[in-house]
Structures are given as C-alpha cells and as structure tokens.
C-alpha cells in the first residue's frame, strides 16, 4: 500500500514550483473553455457535491489539454449576498473578513484535490476591481432605459429584512409564501425598487434556447418561466362602472361557458371596491401572506364576491365578478374568465362558490351550448369567435409573458453598491467614477424599516458635487449580479491582474477568442435564476457589440447529487453529511476523485458507499504495485498486447468525448487486468496508460511516470495516438439475445462499443420494433454477446 500523503505533498510542491497549471493564451490552438459554477465560500468548506462537480470539469479539462487544445479552466468565488451576511450576523463577524478567510480555506482544499486551476485567473465578486464592472454593466443598462426605479408590489421578508425576487419565493405546504433561503414568511409590500427590464429580451431568451446543448428539462423550465402565450384580450364591460375588465385568454372558443370572472388580489377593481367594502378589504389583507407565485398553483381557492357584475360581450348576460387567490398576479391582465367545465382551477373555484358550470365542448371537440357556433370544431370556433369580438371592438390579439421584470434592489449591506446618486429633486444620476466602494460598517444588521443598513453611514450617503447636495442609493444589488458575467471576468484577467476594462480592445479580443463557454457544469437548481439572468446580461452585451456570441454557455451538464449513505440528500439536520477532507487524509485525493467518477453517469444522483471508496483505493494499490513490483518494462510486446493497448485507448477516448467518465475507469481496469496477465508493458504504452490515468488520478500518475523515467510532467503530456488500422481488419461475431433468447448475429470490428452494436442491430426493422419497447437493462460482453432484457 503506497503512502498517498507523501506522494500528494511531493507533487503539489513540484507543480507549484514549476507553475504547471499556469494558463498561457495561444491563438494558434483550438480553444476549449470549461467552467464550473463558482462556489459561495461558506464556513463549512467544500462538500462532496463540490468535489464531484469539480472533478468532472478537471478530468475534461486535462483531457482536452492532452488533445492539444488551448484550455481555460478557471475558478472564482461568489462571495456577496444573503448567505454570507446572515452567517456573519449570527456569528457576530464582519462579512468581508469572514468571507476572505473562507476563500483561503476553499483554495487550500481545492489545491489538495489536485484540480488544475490557475489561481492567477481567480476572482471574487467582492473585489472592488471586479464589481467595478458589475456597476459598469448596470450603468449601461440604466443608459439604455433597461434599469429604472419604480413603485412596485414586492415580496418583503421581515426576518431577512429585504425584498426578494419572484424566483426567490416558494410556496410552503400550507400555501404560504416563504423565502427560498430560510423558509421565512414573505408578504406583499409596495416599495420603490430598481428593476431590470429582462422582459425586453423575452423573445430573444426563448429563441436562443433552441441553439443550446442543454438538458431539455432545464430549457423547458426556462420556456415555462418566460411563458409566452398568444391569445386574445377580451373586454367585459362592468354594469355599474364606466370601466371594463380586460381578460386575456388563449381559449376564446370557451366564452359561452363563462359563469364568473375572477380578478387577482392586486387588480384595480378589487382595490377600488376594498375602499368601501370592509369584507373585501379584510380578504385582500389576509391574502398578502398567501401570495401565489408561478412556481406552484394555489391549493385553497379562496375568493369573495365583489357584488358587481360584468356584461357578457356576446350574450349580454350578467356575470358575477369575484376576487380570487388562484388568479396569478402579473400574468396577462390579472383577471380570468371562469369556465368551470374546461379548466381545473376554475372548476374547483366554481364548485366551492356554488357557481354554474357550463359544458360548451363535446367529446368530439365540437362546440355545444354556444348558439350560432354549435357544431364548429374548437379550432374553427376559436377563429370565428375571435373575429367576431374584434369586429365589435371588444377584443384584440395579444401576446403575453409570465416573465416579470427583475427586481434588482436589496435592503442589505453585503452587496454591490449602486453607482447612483439622487439630487434634491430625487432624480437619479449615474456616478461616473467607478467603482463605488462598499464602506465598512460596524452595525450592518437590518432593522426591518425597509431601509438599507448603509443609510446609517451618513458621511458616505451625503455628498456634494459642484455645490449640489446628493444622496447615494443605499440599497445594494442582489447576489445574482456578480454571477451574471463572471465567465467574462476570468478572460479579463488574462495577462492583466487588475482586469482589462470590459469595453477595451484587449477584452474584446479575448471575448472573441474564447467565447462561448464550451462546457458549463453545475446544479439544476439555477435554471430560472443564475442561468436566465446571465443569458439576459449576455444578450444585452451582445447588442452593445462587447461580445460576439449570442449565448454565454453552449453546453450545460447538470451533475447529479451525492446522496448520503441512507440514500437521502445530505444535510446537517439528517446527520448524513460527509466531509471530504478527512477522506483525502485517509484514502488520498486520487481515490476520492476516482470513486466520485466511478459511482455512475455524471448526471445521475448516487448514494455514497464507504466500501466503494475502499475498493477504489485498493485498485490504485494494484496500479502502484504493477509498476513498482511486477512490471517488466520492455519494448518487446506481443500482437495481443498491441491490440489490447490500442483498444484501451480507442474506447477511453470515445467515452471521454461522450463524458462517460465512469466507463473510462472501467477501461483502465480492464487494461490493468490484461497487464497483470502479461506482466509486460513498453515505455510508450506506460506513457499512454498513465496519461489517461492522470486525468483522474494525477498524483499517482506523476509518481509512476517518474518511476518509469518518462518525461515530466505527465499532466502536461499529449495523449497517445490510436492505431485504427488494427480495427479495420480485426472482426468478430456478436450475438444479440433478447430476454435470454437468440435473436440475431452480426459481424463487428473488434472492440466495438455497446451503443454502436445495439444501433447496428436496430437497422433491422423487426429488431428495432422489439427494442423500442421499454428496456430494463442491457448486458454486453464485448466482442461476444449483447443481451437485452425487456421490462415485463
């Protein structure tokens, strides 16, 4: 058993002394930009989820370097925001010094795992040299009228002392609005807030999704969040008011099934009636704590009759109007036409309120109970009714979006200051000299007043410029601001430790050279937060011609979670968390890296098993023992060895290209078993094997590379080439078995992969029809048999 602690310490020192991971920009090579979602530097340090995600990108980064690409693989720290501030408040520490301590700890941990980051390119969002450009981008948004200060109903969290974006609010099991962080109560409150007009880019954000190699569920979440709908806005005249209620609907063909109208608690009519109706006023007040968001439909279906009627635009019948908590605020017109027979939500509400339910569509999808439109198909009726309403000036064609503008203010201390000052007329002006630095505060706790803690520093707030008194904006930006553009920040650090100006020719050249990010790896939980916001900012910068790509991240991989030994998500409350640092001490970083990659496909969530880690360590001992005790290094190798070695390389590269990292480890195991049988390996073959091993286990690979007397460093070596001619002549017959019964046999090139063999058999229509049934599992014995087990 080798001493991993000594080997890791030795090679960390050598790599540092030779600056092995230093990034060198080379325009003569094809670029590859691989990026991790950068971490929030918590006091707890790295967890296994971090290590798994960062090992994925590290393996891929090393592979592309070995293929001759100019690879950039940076790391930084998302250090502003609520998590750091809340922890600092609870522990009575300054968030700045506390965050810097955590970052140093993170860097030490990241280094111990052997990741190939170049820390010359590292950044933190709390660095004024960095957030200078966060402020610069905001300034440009302001100049483009895409940032404005508005009085708006916001999600106010008393315990956190700040406003939350819609994306940061969840609905708990009782139907109450709560904060995503901490599950604190959230209520509606009208406040003056900065908003960014992300809705301006709604169509561009939708269209861009079709060009991205992202998991389809993530793209669908963004499509649903943007929520583009084409329909009709119909005016229902109120009987006792001059005004009409505008209703957006995508199903005008159901208009004869309307038995009520319902407006949201934020609708102008509900507010107007509440001024003179105490019951309505009480209902609206009660609903402030039960705000419906787009994330989850309301389950209570509460409502109250507004004691007014609307006039049906085609029948002139009177229709009761309700205020209801299931009507989504901010979508369409804040009002719906209730069609209980053809909408689940309307049905629940109608039955609860004992309202009529009128079925206007029969089982053949034709209209009934719809006067002159009876017998028309739903599509025919949709067109005919829409045209009739438009001809009477009672409707118009409309496109609406669920997406709301991004509330960008936070009433907290630990965030980027706005580059804004207000004159004596309360008119906002941009600060020209950036950055506007965040001042130190002794007391940065929110007081619940709605004012930022920065308001307490009057010496900072009040300034005089050209004999005019100004006050600084005291709200700060949300924690998502710095992460909207950090992938550009890394590029701005190339050959400039203080960042190239974002609008400089040097930065533009680097953006043109390295964008888009070729591979982005991170959690699926950021689908409608970071990933949407970053795309929005990037499209704005594209319109300004600062970047030349329409999208920032071309390919996205969501790594699966590492579950606790009990199969549940790791959490301190469950007592099933595992600290990776002691595992490095006991088993070595190489063993942990290998096990995290060998557990299964990178997108799958997998259960931690101590024995799996032990097994991986034993396998590394086998590798070590072969090279130190059993290997006979010679240039004389058999044809069988030549074929086995080239098959190992071919399959390994194929799996690496497909990001099937667990299968690469399987190929290494197969080849090592072969080596133990032959007890021989040439120096060239040793180099090829150790190069692949170095992607996963760089420490041991370096040690064995040195033992063989090969050129240092193995982590800088190019991959060995495959002799593909060997496979053009080497053929073998593979049998296809379905549920254990012979089905067919076919000739294949030796070493063919399972997916290729299966696809080849599927060329036969009869076999393809059978294999299109649900498959339980596939067992493939390479070059011999493939057995497909169908689900019963």
Swiss-Prot record:
GO terms for cellular component: cytosol. One of its GO terms (molecular function) is leucine-tRNA ligase activity. The keyword Nucleotide-binding applies. A motif ('HIGH' region) lies at residues 39-50. A motif ('KMSKS' region) lies at residues 569-573. Keywords: Aminoacyl-tRNA synthetase, ATP-binding, Cytoplasm, Ligase, Nucleotide-binding, Protein biosynthesis. GO terms for biological process: leucyl-tRNA aminoacylation. It catalyses: tRNA(Leu) + L-leucine + ATP = L-leucyl-tRNA(Leu) + AMP + diphosphate. It is found in: Cytoplasm. It is an enzyme of class 6 (ligase). Its EC number is 6.1.1.4. The keyword Ligase applies. InterPro entries: aa-tRNA-synth_I_CS, aa-tRNA-synth_Ia, Leu-tRNA-ligase, Leu_tRNA-synth_edit, Methionyl/Leucyl_tRNA_Synth, Rossmann-like_a/b/a_fold, tRNAsynth_Ia_anticodon-bd, Val/Leu/Ile-tRNA-synth_edit. Its main location: cytoplasm. Signal peptide: none annotated. ATP binds at residue 572. HAMAP family: Leu_tRNA_synth_B. Belongs to the class-I aminoacyl-tRNA synthetase family. This is Leucine--tRNA ligase. It comes from Mycoplasma genitalium (strain ATCC 33530 / DSM 19775 / NCTC 10195 / G37). The gene is leuS.
